[in-house]
Swiss-Prot record:
PROSITE patterns from the UniProt entry: PTS_EIIB_TYPE_2, PTS_EIIC_TYPE_2
Protein name (database record): PTS system mannitol-specific EIICB component
Membrane topology: Multi-pass membrane protein
InterPro entries assigned: PTS_EIIB-like_sf, PTS_EIIB_2, PTS_EIIB_2/3, PTS_EIIB_mannitol, PTS_EIIC, PTS_EIIC_2, PTS_IIC_mtl, Sugar_PTS
Organism: Streptococcus pneumoniae (strain ATCC BAA-255 / R6)
Amino acid sequence: MEEKVSLKVRVQKLGTSLSNMVMPNIGAFIAWGVLTALFIADGYLPNEQLATVVGPMLTYLLPILIGYTGGYMIHGQRGAVVGSIATVGAITGSSVPMFIGAMVMGPLGGWTIKKFDEKFQEKIRPGFEMLVNNFSAGLVGFALLLLAFYAIGPVVSTLTGAVGNGVEAIVNARLLPMANIIIEPAKVLFLNNALNHGIFTPLGVEQVAQAGKSILFLLEANPGPGLGILLAYAVFGKGSAKSSSWGAMVIHFFGGIHEIYFPYVMMKPTLFLAAMAGGISGTFTFQLLDAGLKSPASPGSIIAIMATAPKGVWPHLNILLGVLVAAVVSFLIAALILHADKSTEDSLEAAQAATQAAKAQSKGQLVSTSVDAVVSTDSVEKIIFACDAGMGSSAMGASILRDKVKKAGLELPVSNQAISNLLDTPKTLIVTQEELTPRAKDKSPSAIHVSVDNFLASPRYDEIVASLTGASPIAEIEGDIPTSAPVDSQEIDLNHIDAVVVAYGKAQGTATMGCETIRAIFRNKNIRIPVSTAKISELGEFNSKNIMIVTTISLQAEVQQAAPNSQFLIVDSLVTTPEYDKMAARMYK
């Protein structure tokens, strides 16, 4: 079983290393796409002088950035410099944009100078360090430049041409939609960025240089399949999965954070069929209508997709139609699956944990049930949220915990980054999703590691804050995590509630989502009680026993002090808690 785990981790590392050379530089790709869309001959604002910048950016800037980043990943600044020099050799030794060559020469340059330093660094006599370091980087880079110019560049150019011809043949044979049979499951299994930015982006940029647009940018970024699945949960789902799907739809479709719908698919693995069918139908529509984008859409938001579409009304409508078809097809299939489902489990959070545990165990992984050390302000100096790409859901998770840490009066930095960029530093608390914890531990064994089911709604955040403030230690077993506060919702006289208020501190986002979740549940149960949000400083207006205030464990004391006469429902998450369904079942208004 250990061999299977290590193989899986190695595959993830390979895919991640490719995407991590591209993702930090997506801004440059977007800048090039905007420049192309505006100033080339058929752009929105044709300009011959500015159009001359398009070619050099494509040929030199973008590959050198990739090579620089690849070298930096291996050996810091010295690796980045040598990787850039080597990449120039590949660029000038070829007649095609050298993205794949940059992905080879960048890490190779970093690895070569790293091995040189390991062998000779300790042998340098005092006073000669700068001389040796500068000349070694220059000479190693020079040697790799010659190698890339005469060998790597031509070989990669031939391979790139072959791959491009293969993609063109697949497109001409109308077989491109079949790629979604692999793409959609891979997205849910943390390979979405590897596919999109490690494979499709380099190939797509070359297509844009030739044809002005590329359908490859739409294969993984299409939000249609996820939108259809979330909509099916909103109509045919049960419990907290149903009520939380509305907020998830907004984040997925407009925010472009596709990771938010992954747990909904993991809850019922048969929904992979809905995702694949939606992806296939969407790509088929894109291909039928000759749709494409001028640059990568990152994140996969409908706003970013529309912004990078070619000039004209029809190109935008063609893309929207492809997204719509994908959403409708995935919705219909997911609706059939959910409607036929007879299970009684209706807690998204519980199903998430069960699915993640079963998934990890089936792959030979041990589910992380405890932290590696005591969490306190003495043992933790910073908190890092780590994920495959270091963006998206980990950034949102970091934002949520950062807000909780500030409210607790702690001065701890909370940031997010890619697992591949983690350093082995002590006194660091690293939060990862269970699927990625083995890789994080491998990169940073000295850190304290905490696994969560879902970055966007985890009860472990309140546990971490409580442990850091000395209120209580982190629960050793995940199953022991409390799902509500000391105030028991069973004791609340629910039949004498005239209004429900969701309280928030500085950030209103999760409170708004929680408010919409409760409203959706009340509508389904025909409960006519108004639900609103309020800042803690405004709770004095709701200080009455016929008002129920909903808040989280971390804000409980502050909220009860602001409105001591109100009734309270304390939950672990304002969005995914099962307490809302239990509350509605006991209300008869």
